[in-house]
From Swiss-Prot:
CDD domains listed in its UniProt record: TOPRIM_recR
InterPro entries in alphabetical order: DNA_Rcmb_RecR, Rcmb_RecR, Rcmb_RecR_Znf, TOPRIM_dom, TOPRIM_RecR
SMART domains on file: TOPRIM (SM00493)
Keyword Zinc-finger (UniProt): yes
Protein name: Recombination protein RecR
GO biological process: DNA recombination; DNA repair
HAMAP family reported for this sequence: RecR (MF_00017)
Function: May play a role in DNA repair. It seems to be involved in an RecBC-independent recombinational process of DNA repair. It may act with RecF and RecO.
Pfam families: RecR_C, RecR_HhH, RecR_ZnF, Toprim_4
Coiled-coil annotated residue ranges, if any: none
PROSITE patterns attached to this UniProt entry: RECR (PS01300), TOPRIM (PS50880)
GO molecular function: DNA binding; zinc ion binding
Family stated for the protein in its record: Belongs to the RecR family.
Amino acid sequence: MDLYPESILNLIKSLSTLPGIGRRTAERLALHILHAPLHEAQTLANDILELKQKVTLCRTCFSLSDQPECRICSNPRRDASIICVVEKPTDIVAIEKSGAFSGLYHVLGGALSPMDGIGPDELRIRELFSRACSKTTTEVIIATGTNVEGEATAAYISDQLRKKGVNVTRIASGVPMGGDFQYVDQVTMQRAMEGRRGF
């Protein structure tokens, strides 16, 4: 039997629908919000509403943006001749944190997965081909995941773009920094050996 008032139960139920939030965590969050100053709760509510109302997809790269073009696509300092293809907007965040890339991005919106009914038409591959075949593009870097779906997506895009004469590369993968060889799987080790470079 729940002893909380209905409004608290409703918030617990809503919070527990979020990824990684179970009932106990949702309960703690709901009680925290209840005891927080009213302006903090109002700010949180307003931020959620603003997120839902303003955030959309960039018209160029399909990343998240609150403007027609995202900050990266609208930045004249970015190298517009290189496009890095990723599966989702969070992949951009990871790459940007590295500081190793200064080009533009293209978010596919997922990866090919025939078992789940996701083919090329369900992703933003057509839009990628249009961008990649422009005269200003010198390289397309494929940075999809290294799982089966990511590899299949990379192979499909690479094959199609090479037929169109586009220079295509794939991000390297291999042994992580500080990784112990005894814990590295065979595929990762194989890729690390194949992707070796001068030192």
